[in-house]
Amino acid sequence: KKSTRREEERRKMEERDYHSLQKGTKLNGRYIIEDVLGEGGFGITYAGRDELLGVKVAVKEYYPQGIVVRNNSVDDVVTVTYAKQKDVFNKGKTKFLEEARVIAKFNDQEGIVNVTDFFEANNTAYIVMEYLDGITLKEYIAENGVLSPEDILELMAPVLESLDEVHKQGLIHRDISPDNIMLLKNGKVKLMDFGAARDYTDFGEKSLSIVLKPGYAPEEQYRS
């Protein structure tokens, strides 16, 4: 039994997540981390609470995999793995914060997630957004089957109207795919992840090959 207990403790240690922020961590003096919502190649998204306003929020942390490390049992600071990667990290952080500024321009648009704050801390950067309570369009289709063209048009109307405003500002969203669209419990539909948005006058050959997502990329990219 002692051996089994030790094995169980070892297994729990191995499974423990040491790189994301721990539950209860406070950011910027007001945002309390509650849970990890998801993780991608460039960041970690948390569910949190704004102590000042008393509302639930989503907090996106710039955490590019393979470039940084953190041991949350010691502190919350993110460390760049190799000195030669520092420039890459800093450029990425600048673009990450620019994402916040881009989304904030469209906070009055019903079909786009709202940004409420952004800041730097722990040697990295954070974007605070409204918490979206629902499922992605991808998940909805997996559960309910393919939607008719009529249903899709009705569902996507707020997003399409918001994208029209985005395009008027000289920006395009490079990934309007089902996993980037949230269907909320209150019936609203929101487009997420504006890290895939950029000025459509600034396409280079290299960036096109990296970011073009067949089937979901805007036609401006195919013409560039």
Residue ranges and their predicted role:
Residues 207-221:
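Conserved activation segment of eukaryotic-like protein kinases, specifically the C-terminal portion
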Residues 122-136:
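Conserved short submotifs of the Hanks-type protein kinase catalytic core
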Residues 137-147:
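AlphaC helix of the protein kinase catalytic domain
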Residues 73-105:
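AlphaC helix of the eukaryotic protein kinase fold
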Residues 160-171:
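Protein kinase catalytic-loop region centered on the HRD/HxD motif
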Residues 118:
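Activation-segment/catalytic-loop signature of the eukaryotic protein kinase fold
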Residues 155-156:
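Activation segment signature within eukaryotic-like protein kinase domains
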